Regions:
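Conserved N-terminal catalytic/coupling substructures associated with nucleotide/phosphate chemistry
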Residues: 1-256
Length: 256
């Protein structure tokens, strides 16, 4: 067997160059992004979450928005990083094509019945998507214990939230396709463009492994907000949440 040469183009070349430089997609600076274009309501929401999580010092949370971003390591020199766009800009799509979530409800014969698009920064997208899925797309079974009303969804809320966070944090946003969520009466499928760490397989994900997020700056902000653990246990938590509520196991697929 002989050596082969492979020509890299487009996003594949970009990923290769970033790896050579020891950079990640979300750590690249954005020259034309100003503090004034970021969303104050999202900063308020983040401070609320981070205070509850106790994963940041109170003094850091009382700093102004620029100081807070510095504590989150969202500056590269004088420039804000792409992670700041995804986390705190009200319209990341001005800078990142396809940075939104698309939801569709399908009949079993694959006919699309209705659909929605969820835009905004990642904190906004996750909140809106969870609300849409649990109020419009998934039908809850209603039961009662004495006078208490209990809603049981086809997918446990904890598992759904963990899967959604995983998809948003680990997406390769150089891929211009949005995250897609396909819902039927019996299934829910989340698809995002992304890559496993080099040498990893689905078996790696299903076994004990360390945390290696594709977008570490984005992941750090969600960790500080108390939204994730950052211990590489997201997949384990999804499976456990499903088992605890008596649901069938989850299927994971990865296609390069």
């Amino acid at each position: 067997s002989g050596a082969t040469n492979q020509e890299l183009k487009g996003t594949a070349l970009d990923r290769f160059m970033l790896r050579r430089l020891g950079k990640t997609w979300d750590g690249v600076p954005v020259p034309h992004l100003s503090m004034n274009s970021l969303d104050n309501e999202t900063f308020t929401l983040f401070r609320k979450y981070a205070k509850l999580s106790q994963r940041m010092y109170e003094a850091d949370l009382q700093d102004d928005n620029k100081g807070l971003l510095e504590k989150l390591r969202l500056f590269e020199g004088a420039y804000l990083k792409r992670a700041a766009v995804m986390l705190f800009h009200s319209d990341p799509e001005k800078f990142v094509t396809g940075a939104y979530i698309k939801i569709g409800f399908f009949r079993e014969d694959a006919d699309l019945v209705y659909q929605d698009e969820v835009h905004g920064n990642l904190f906004q997208q996750i909140r809106k998507t969870m609300e849409l899925l649990t109020t419009k797309y998934m039908k809850a079974v209603i039961t009662y214990e004495d006078i208490q009303r209990i809603e049981t969804f086809p997918v446990p809320r904890e598992a759904l939230r963990e899967a959604l966070l995983n998809a948003c944090i680990n997406k390769d946003y150089a891929d211009t396709s949005p995250i897609q969520i396909r819902v039927t009466d019996t299934t829910l499928q989340i698809v995002n463009g992304g890559f496993l760490p080099e040498g990893w397989t689905i078996d790696t994900l299903l076994s004990s492994h360390r945390s290696m997020p594709y977008n570490p700056d984005i992941a750090n902000a969600f960790f500080r907000a108390g939204e994730i653990e950052a211990w590489g246990r997201g997949i384990e938590r999804i499976i456990k949440a499903c088992k605890n509520e008596g649901f069938s196991t989850v299927d994971f697929c990865y296609n390069e």
